[in-house]
UniProtKB/Swiss-Prot annotation:
Signal peptide range in chain numbering: none
UniProt region (Head domain (RuvB-H)), positions on chain: 257-345
CDD domains assigned: AAA
Protein name: Holliday junction branch migration complex subunit RuvB
Origin species: Methylococcus capsulatus (strain ATCC 33009 / NCIMB 11132 / Bath)
Keyword flag Cell membrane: no
EC number: 3.6.4.-
GO molecular function terms listed in the Swiss-Prot or TrEMBL record: ATP binding; ATP hydrolysis activity; four-way junction DNA binding; four-way junction helicase activity
Residues involved in DNA binding: R293, R312, R317
Main localization of the protein described in the UniProt heading: cytoplasm
Catalytic activity: ATP + H2O = ADP + phosphate + H(+)
Gene field: ruvB
Annotated ATP binding sites: I22, R23, G64, K67, T68, T69, E130, D131, Y132, R173, Y183, R220
């Protein structure tokens, strides 16, 4: 099973301390997502001017793009505290009530994976978001009674990688909604250069660009690759990260110029060599490469689809012309479902 991939956008347990050190603290230091930054700066300034809590904020998009970082920045810009939790952790209504009643006025409550909130907990959240009130039950059995508690005005920042799983009543209660997009190579180069400065590593523009190109449009991956390249530069070079040093380090780490690792290449080659490029069903593909359906669907496929190397069709997965050209292979003649992918050879 694919775990702890170097190019995985999911966070890893041993990265948290370093990630905290290199995360930007203010909007002016946040690279990329220009439209979102400009809008958030206006909303925050307006809320501060009125002395009110910022409207509730929903941030969605692929993992590793900076949702947690943005929640911390919002709190810093507002000059308030931020409390962190996640959907799976809030198992009971009382868990959420305890968090809400301990907030100070205008504090930020950050709920990661908010799409995984249970229905009972979500019901408690509705009046809290809308009216700054919650209903809690006191006692048990016939003597039980409901009391209404007033909450201080607060800002809920919800983050999710799967916005489509949010219920309409919850989604409609967010006044500010932003989707985070993948980053350009130029933006990632700036992020890598900034992180290198914070880590005390010397890096050239070419070195930063080389790391950025292989980072799959994702800052979390860029920072992870930078740390590994820094190790390589320290031991195998003079400590300075040049384009050549970064390239050699990443080749040794099995990350190619497209940001693909061994798992990506195995998936693509299996489709092309064993299934003639497809269409191939997900179950057959999972059995052929020894992975679970969910791993292919949620971990391996998204980036390959986004880059145009795999296409989902009603009949199954298909390797595109880009996939064949990437490996120096000749795309086969196609008919029917795949004619539009390969054209006439």
């Amino acid at each position: 099973m694919t775990t702890q991939r170097l190019v995985s956008a999911a966070g890893q347990w041993d990265e948290e301390a370093i990630d905290r050190a290199i995360r930007p603290k203010r909007l002016e230091d946040y690279v990329g997502q220009r439209a979102m930054r400009e809008q958030m700066a206006i909303f925050i300034q307006a809320a501060l001017g009125r002395g009110e809590a910022l409207d509730h904020v929903l941030i969605f998009g692929p993992p590793g793009l900076g949702k947690t970082t943005l929640a911390n920045i919002i709190a810093n810009e507002l000059g308030v505290n931020v409390r962190h939790t996640s959907g799976p952790v809030l198992e009971k209504a009382g868990d959420l009530a305890a968090l809400l009643t301990n907030l100070e006025p205008r504090d930020v409550l950050f709920i990661d994976e908010i799409h995984r909130l249970g229905a009972v907990v979500e019901e408690v959240l509705y009046p809290a978001m809308e009216d700054y009130q919650i209903d809690i039950m006191i006692g048990e059995g016939p003597a039980a009674r409901s009391i209404k508690l007033d909450l201080p005005p607060f800002t809920l920042v919800g983050a999710t990688t799967r916005a489509g799983l949010l219920t309409s009543p919850l989604r409609d209660r967010f006044g500010i909604v932003h989707r985070l997009e993948f980053y350009s190579v130029e933006e990632l180069s700036r992020i890598v250069a900034r992180s290198a400065r914070i880590l005390g590593s010397e890096i050239t523009p070419e070195g930063a660009a080389e790391v950025a190109r292989r980072s799959r449009g994702t800052p979390r991956i860029a920072n992870r690759l930078l740390r590994r390249v820094r190790d390589f530069a320290q031991v195998m070079a003079d400590g300075r990260i040049t384009g050549e040093v970064a390239g050699k380090a990443l080749e040794m780490l099995d990350v190619d110029p497209n940001g693909f690792d061994q798992s990506d290449r195995r998936l693509l080659l299996t489709m092309m060599e064993k299934f003639e490029g497809g269409p191939v069903g997900l179950d057959n593909l999972a059995a052929a490469i020894g992975e679970e359906r969910g791993t292919i669907e949620d971990v391996l496929e998204p980036y390959l689809i986004q880059q145009g190397f795999i296409m989902r069709t009603p009949r199954g997965r298909v390797a595109t012309r880009n996939a064949y050209l990437h490996f120096g292979l000749k795309p086969p003649q196609r008919t029917n479902v795949n004619e539009e992918l390969f054209g006439d050879e």
